[in-house]
């Protein structure tokens, strides 16, 4: 800005403007003319800090009203409401669109969110399911460039690892070399004592962040854990009768977010426990679809996740359940 222009504009500093007039003038220059706070300060003969305070006062008083004309506007409001309602560290709500499979869209959203959380060389723990693998697939370039290490939270992830084939050969990936569920509690106990399983589980409990899928009994035959053959339709119905609304890592939760008691499957799983999962600093749940609202709400209520990536229809349903 020229000295002449500054001199011309600084005449406003000597005017007996009311505070509202001053707020309006500052807001016009900032939002309409696109001037920086420093430029406005020079024009009005005011320090930049004063300009900043006037803008904040304008927003608080209603003189300044910011309108976001975007399909993301409602999603941003939902993110704020979810964050405040559940005390989330991270939340991402995607617009409801039918043009791309939901798992893919959620995976992209989760990958973008994790890029803002993970530091170079940190350890990311990965749960069972298609959506989490979609996330890792879209995060693969970041994982390679930042040398983020991967560890699985449970067994059964091996078949999905084809989704991260783009990872650099130097990347560290530790997998539990076993299925999600085995035939009995005795077999699970034996395998957990094997170093190849025990060491990976131990590493997972020290992860810097985790990403997990959330299954729902409302999905019926579409539930990943059922399609993968780890439970039968009969078991799914029985779990629902006992109060289960969904699962994380194969552990079935009731509406309060507590593990449903007296289920054999809970003793036959290979991986970290829900208590161990809840101790991690950042646990991002990735799930969408109105049929999953009960399960997502349970996970939030039980504080099993402190981050959420979902889509707007699901977010509204979860908030409706929360009242």
Swiss-Prot record:
Transmembrane segments: none annotated. Keywords: Cytoplasm, DNA-binding, Repressor, Transcription, Transcription regulation. The keyword Repressor applies. Inactivated by phosphorylated autoinducer-2 (phospho-AI-2). Phospho-AI-2 acts by binding to LsrR, which is then unable to bind to the promoter regions, allowing the transcription of the target genes. One of its GO terms (molecular function) is DNA binding. Residues 37-60 bind DNA. Gene3D superfamilies: 3.40.50.1360, Winged helix-like DNA-binding domain superfamily/Winged helix DNA-binding domain. It is found in: Cytoplasm. GO terms for cellular component: cytoplasm. InterPro entries: NagB/RpiA_transferase-like, SorC_transcr_regulators, Sugar-bd_dom_put, WH-like_DNA-bd_sf. The keyword Cytoplasm applies. Belongs to the SorC transcriptional regulatory family. Transcriptional regulator that represses the expression of the lsr operon in the absence of the quorum-sensing signaling molecule autoinducer 2 (AI-2). It also represses the expression of the lsrRK operon. Acts by binding to the intergenic region between the lsr operon and lsrR. In the presence of phosphorylated autoinducer-2 (phospho-AI-2), LsrR is inactivated, leading to the transcription of the genes. This is Transcriptional regulator LsrR. It comes from Enterobacter sp. (strain 638). The gene is lsrR.
